[in-house]
């Protein structure tokens, strides 16, 4: 079954015919073109050509058209130094950040967003209906931290009105950007979010429903990666998957939910919930933990990576790294 058909089945709440294998590979492709990263990320031709070449070599279920957790902040006006590894964002003053949100204009036409959208257009034509087209974006809480610093998390947890207004604006921006990628032809949107403060969790989830529903409405699958706050726990006596109390009833409706990206500890027993999930493999280290119980679970619909495979990896080792990941679930 083709990857795009599997994504559509997941959107419709149907069990997938097989799991998808989509490690996130983007900036590493710059090494195929042998160009500086700062040149690569603004050149849709080089991006599309190198990603197509990687797909022809690795035959993955998805191609990561763009992955940049600073993309939205830069679009809003933040300065990004791409010559460092990893790239460094210069955080604006609070007053400047507020002005950025107030005078944002049409963010889809600013920064590198037009480049990223063009890559999706090109790969959709070049690769036809073979792999799923993937976009990696920051969650709105991550963008808030980039703009306002760590204090914004405490302010949101305390219910500060200014912080809440800024967060709602960032959710609107996230929704607009996500919709643009869906309309361009992306099939899977990977949202990399921060830990959500417990006190802010209900508000965060309620606000994010609009993003999940919009992405699904446009025929794409939202995938949510969060370090710990939404970690699903396993009850060893019942083998049941339990959400935190604050989220019960909120992620049970697939139409209002993302595909949760889980990062289990080695050897931990997989949840049996009837609810599909994605499994994130670590992107660093020579060996992988034993995640066979999770891979045997029929609910494991997607195997991906915990973020982007780093640019620092030697391009010659990419095929070896992907083969090691693939070997984990062959035969499961």
Give the label of every model feature segment.
Residues 46-68, 176-188, 238-242, 249:
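Catalytic domains of carbohydrate-active enzymes, especially glycoside hydrolases
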Residues 33-46, 152-176, 278-286:
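Active-site mouth loops of central-metabolism enzymes
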Residues 89, 108-131, 200-224, 328:
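Alpha-helix-loop-beta-strand connector modules within alpha/beta enzyme cores
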Residues 6-12, 32, 216-332:
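Catalytic-face loop-and-helix region of soluble metabolic enzyme cores
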Residues 81-180:
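Active-site-proximal, glycine-rich beta->alpha crossover segments in alpha/beta enzymes
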Residues 1-28, 36, 117-129, 162-165:
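N-terminal amphipathic alpha-helix/helix-capping segment at the start of soluble metabolic enzymes
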Residues 17-118:
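Alpha/beta catalytic barrel-like cores
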Residues 70-80, 134-156, 184-207:
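Active-site-proximal loop/short-helix segments
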């Amino acid at each position: 079954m083709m990857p795009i058909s599997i994504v559509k089945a997941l959107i419709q709440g149907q069990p997938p015919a097989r799991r998808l294998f989509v490690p996130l590979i983007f900036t590493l492709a710059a090494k195929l073109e042998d160009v500086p990263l700062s040149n690569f990320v603004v050149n849709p031709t080089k991006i599309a050509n190198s990603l197509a070449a990687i797909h022809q070599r690795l035959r993955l279920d998805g191609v990561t058209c763009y992955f940049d957790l600073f993309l939205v902040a830069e679009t809003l006006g933040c300065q990004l130094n791409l010559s460092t590894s990893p790239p460094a964002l210069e955080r604006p003053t609070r007053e400047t950040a507020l002005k950025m949100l107030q005078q944002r204009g049409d963010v889809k036409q600013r920064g590198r967003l037009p480049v990223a959208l063009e890559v999706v257009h090109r790969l959709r034509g070049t690769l036809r209906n073979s792999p799923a087209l993937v976009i990696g974006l920051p969650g709105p809480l991550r963008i808030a931290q980039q703009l306002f610093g760590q204090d914004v998390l405490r302010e949101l947890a305390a219910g500060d009105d200014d912080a809440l207004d800024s967060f709602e604006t960032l959710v609107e921006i996230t929704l607009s950007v996500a919709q643009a990628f869906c309309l361009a032809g992306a099939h899977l949107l990977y949202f990399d979010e921060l830990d959500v403060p417990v006190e802010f969790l209900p508000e965060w989830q309620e606000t994010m429903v609009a993003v999940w529903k919009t992405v699904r409405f446009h025929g794409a699958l939202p995938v949510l990666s969060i370090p710990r706050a939404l970690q699903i726990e396993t009850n060893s006596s019942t083998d049941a998957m339990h959400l935190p109390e604050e989220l019960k009833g909120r992620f049970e409706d697939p139409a209002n939910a993302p595909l949760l990206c889980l990062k289990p500890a080695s050897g931990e027993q997989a949840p049996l919930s009837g609810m599909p999930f994605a499994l994130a493999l670590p992107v660093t280290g020579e060996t992988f933990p034993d995640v066979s119980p999770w891979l045997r679970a029929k609910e494991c619909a997607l195997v991906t990576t915990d973020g982007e495979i780093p640019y620092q990896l030697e391009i010659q080792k990419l095929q070896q790294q992907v083969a090691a990941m693939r070997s984990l679930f062959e035969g499961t």
